[in-house]
Amino acid sequence: MTRQTPPSVQIHHTGHDHWILSIQDTSGTVFLLDSKNPRQTVSASTQIQMSRIYSSNGNMIPVNLPTVQQQTNSIDCGVFAIAYATEFCFNQYTGGKGLTFNTSVMRDHLLQCLSNKQLQPFPKVQPKKILK
């Protein structure tokens, strides 16, 4: 792995059958988006990968762990990582509430993007309006 300059995105394998996304925004701040980690912990493998990618001297770096939409099964982590990466590239999304992907069409959307050889933002669920 080689050092990257911001902005940058990287999909990581955690070493535990799981895929996550790291982002370094234009200010150099690093975010870790994990669709199946409500405790927000970082594996040793991921820490090593991120220090090699984002640290100028290979030391550990501070990482922000924002709240993100959590997957409801054990197989969608890769699709979520790609969706988050795409959202960052199009809209500078670095995590946080307010973004909910339409999980029922995520895989079909990814297949369509790959077929077209062009990523597009993943479909989202619109927030429900509250009637008064």
Model regions: which residues?
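Cysteine protease-like catalytic core of ubiquitin/ubiquitin-like
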Residues: 1-113
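C-terminal helix/juxtamembrane-tail motif
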Residues: 105-132
